[in-house]
């Protein structure tokens, strides 16, 4: 089950 999540910082 997926829900809208806040944007995450770019992975290193």
From Swiss-Prot:
One of its GO terms (molecular function) is toxin activity. It is found in: Secreted. Expressed by the venom gland. Belongs to the bradykinin-potentiating peptide family. GO terms for biological process: regulation of blood pressure. This is Bradykinin-potentiating peptide 12d. Keywords: Hypotensive agent, Metalloenzyme inhibitor, Metalloprotease inhibitor, Protease inhibitor, Pyrrolidone carboxylic acid, Secreted, Toxin. It comes from Bothrops cotiara (Cotiara). This peptide both inhibits the activity of the angiotensin-converting enzyme (ACE) and enhances the action of bradykinin by inhibiting the peptidases that inactivate it. It acts as an indirect hypotensive agent. One of its GO terms (cellular component) is extracellular region. The modification Pyrrolidone carboxylic acid is found at residue 1.
């Amino acid at each position: 089950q997926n829900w809208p999540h806040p944007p995450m910082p770019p992975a290193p």
